Every structure is written in C-alpha cells, then in structure tokens.
Amino acid sequence: MSCSGVVSLRAQSGSEHPAIDEAAKVDSTQGQEINGNSGYAVRRGTNEFGVWGGGSFQATTVFGGLHEDEARGRKFIIAAFRYGRTLAANDSMALQYTLDVVPLAVATNNITQQTTLITPTGSITTFRREATYGGGLTPLGLQLDFRNSARVKPFVHINAGGLLFAKPVPLPDAGKFAFTLEGGTGVRIFTSLRRALTLGVRLHHISNGNLSGSNRGLNQFIFYAGFSAFK
C-alpha cells in the first residue's frame, strides 16, 4: 500500500499543472523564434527610416560618358535620408520601395570652364575645375533583399531621381539640373531586431537627358554605409 501511494503521488505531481507547463513551452518557443533568424525578417508594411552616405574615388569611362581627360581627378560625395516600405515579403525575399532625400551632393574637380587654343601644331584644351554643390531627390527606388529571415541580408537595388547643382555638372554647358540613375548591391547587417547597418556599392549615373548642351554622362562607383531603424 505504501508503494501504491508513492506511485500515485508521483503521477499527481507530474500532471498537477498541465496548463502552466504548456504555457512555458509556448513562451520558450516564442523566445527561440525572436532570438533566432526568423525574428530578423521584415514583413509587408514594415517602414524603414535611415541615413546613409558615401563617395567615389574616381569617375569611370568604362560605360561611356565623359572622355578620359574630362573624367580625370573627379570624386563624388553624397549623403541622404532614406524612407522605405516593404511591398511584399516571405522568409526568402523582401521587396521594398525606397525614397532618398539628398541634402548634400558634391562633385569635386568639376569642369566649370573649358578653353581650347588653336596652335600651328594642333589644339590645346584647358579646364578650370572646382567643387560643385547640390542636392535633390530620388523618389523612384526598388530594393530586393535575399535571405529575409537571416540577420545578414544581401540585396540589389535600382533608383532614379534628380539633382540640382549650383553650377552645371559635369560640363560647363550641361545645365545645373541632372537626372540620376543608380543600380547596386550590398548587405544589411541587423544589430538588433529593428536596427541594421548597410554596406554597399552603387553605379551612379548623372546626365541631363538632352535638356541642354552636352549630354556626356558622369559615371562613378559609390561606396557607402548607412544605418536604419524599422517599424
């Protein structure tokens, strides 16, 4: 009878609080989901608020545009505020609309004056160069993130907008307003569930769309970094 009582007591002890045990299991599972990869996934309707900045070390002529002598010595600095909204998402990918407000764009060694001298042996062209400041808006942007559930997310993007400079860019007769077209890639590294660092490179193209004068575009690879918060 004593043995029977011990067995009965153990059985009662094991099933005394089944609801509490189940709740503990649920809490544990939810904690694993938050602390695991799935907690880093962005969902449809998620908003991004961020800032980024970067620059290029040298303009490129690989894709046409400026001549070698016109592109020489040029650098470009840019800083922007970012708003993004996730349009569609699953565990593998996320598609986002992006808008960038650009308060600062600096084209260094920009050609502001061009002089050509005719000599008996040919012609000599000289340039006057200076830093030219501007700003603008990039309202048309799409970004596709991969590995949406992971903490580190590779992405590709394409953007279009415009910049207004204090002087014509990239040539003296090109006009102060320029259209921009960008395409690039990078990674987002989430430092917490709602904050991320961004590292990337983008091909940045500037041209006036044949609105005035010369339409030889300025092309450059911009390396940049940024920080974003998601809500």
What are these regions (language model features)?
Residues 47-53, 77, 93-101, 154-160, ...:
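Transmembrane beta-strands of outer-membrane beta-barrel proteins
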Residues 62-70, 106-131, 165-173, 212-214:
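Flexible, solvent-exposed loop segments that connect beta-strands
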Residues 51, 55, 79-85, 138-146, ...:
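Residues on the lipid-exposed face of transmembrane beta-strands in outer-membrane beta-barrel proteins
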Residues 9-87, 215, 220-231:
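Short glycine/proline- and aromatic-enriched beta-strand/turn motifs that initiate or cap beta-hairpins
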Residues 37-46, 86-97, 147-154, 191-197:
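Short loop/turn motifs that connect adjacent beta-strands in outer-membrane beta-barrel proteins
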Residues 56-58, 102-108, 161-165, 204-208:
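Structural signature of outer-membrane beta-barrel domains
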Residues 45-47, 73-79, 131-138, 152, ...:
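Residues that define the transmembrane beta-barrel architecture of outer-membrane proteins
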Residues 1-5:
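Bacterial N-terminal signal peptides
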